A protein has these predicted regions:
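Juxtamembrane transmembrane-helix boundary motif
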Residues: 1-8, 14-30, 51-154, 161-169, ...
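Residues at secondary-structure transition points
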Residues: 13-14, 37, 104, 181
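Small-residue hotspots at the loop-to-helix junctions and early N-terminal turns
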Residues: 30-38, 178-182
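Transmembrane alpha-helices of multi-pass small-molecule transport proteins
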Residues: 36-54
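Transmembrane alpha-helical segments of major facilitator superfamily
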Residues: 40, 180-184, 209-210, 214
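Membrane-embedded alpha-helical transmembrane segments of multi-pass integral membrane proteins
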Residues: 44-47, 111-114, 188-191
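Hydrophobic alpha-helical transmembrane segments of multi-pass integral membrane proteins
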Residues: 176-192
Length: 221
């Protein structure tokens, strides 16, 4: 399951929709399962980012960096929002465990529906002829905050949301959006993962097999 989830996370997102319900069904506390998964996803996304960048360098050589880009500053935005999302998850679970289970369940259902809902192909733009196409606007930053918060809170299907944001608000090609999606997931999962670790919301017995299987899936993806 970890290999399949890692591959899905790399290509389109949604691997957490497989892993998180499985961990909860095995009797692991939902918050612990969520925190453990966030930490494992950070490692998976790092492997995916390294693999994608290496592939771009091999296929395009020195032109790999000439693709349309959104810059690295939004990573700080989604990372900070992810910390807030993780804090919200921890606080809700501490206040009412049953409420957190209900919120997680409904979010997973919504994420599955959104993941399967057909979406039309967004119009693409050439950033060389249309400078505004690759210029972040207010909708982009609001969307980034929402993605970051949700990524730290649960994160199921957040990769697909990020790709949707980048292809609509920035009008990036899907391939380029997927590449940037990976680094957004690295930022939000690493930031929220450190918080979960600091609060001891982490199961080492689960992470030991999950991290390498996630990494293998990311490499294959």
């Amino acid at each position: 399951v970890g290999v399949v989830a890692g591959t899905l996370n790399t290509l389109v997102g949604g691997g957490t929709l497989l892993v998180l319900p499985l961990l909860v069904s095995l009797g692991i506390d939902p918050l612990v399962a969520n925190g453990t998964n966030r930490i494992c996803v950070a490692f998976q996304a790092l492997v995916a980012g390294w693999t994608m960048n290496r592939g771009l360098e091999r296929s395009r050589g020195s032109k790999a960096q000439e693709m349309p880009t959104i810059g690295w500053r939004p990573l700080m935005l989604v990372g900070g929002a992810a910390i807030l999302g993780a804090l919200a998850a921890i606080e809700i679970e501490h206040l009412d465990k049953a409420l957190f289970r209900q919120v997680m369940g409904w979010l997973l259902l919504v994420a599955v529906g959104a993941f399967l809902w057909p979406r039309p192909d967004p119009p693409l733009a050439d950033p060389l002829t249309d400078p505004l196409a690759a210029t972040p606007g207010i909708k982009f930053y609001i969307g980034g905050l929402i993605c970051g918060f949700y990524g730290g809170f649960i994160g199921a299907g957040v990769g697909a949301l990020i790709v949707l944001l980048l292809t609509t608000s920035m009008r990036l090609p899907v391939v380029e959006a997927v590449r940037w999606k990976v680094w957004w997931v690295v930022a939000m999962s690493t930031a929220s993962g450190f918080l979960y670790l600091s609060q001891d919301v982490f199961d080492r017995a689960v992470a030991i097999p999950l991290i390498p299987s996630y990494g293998l899936g990311a490499y294959l993806g």
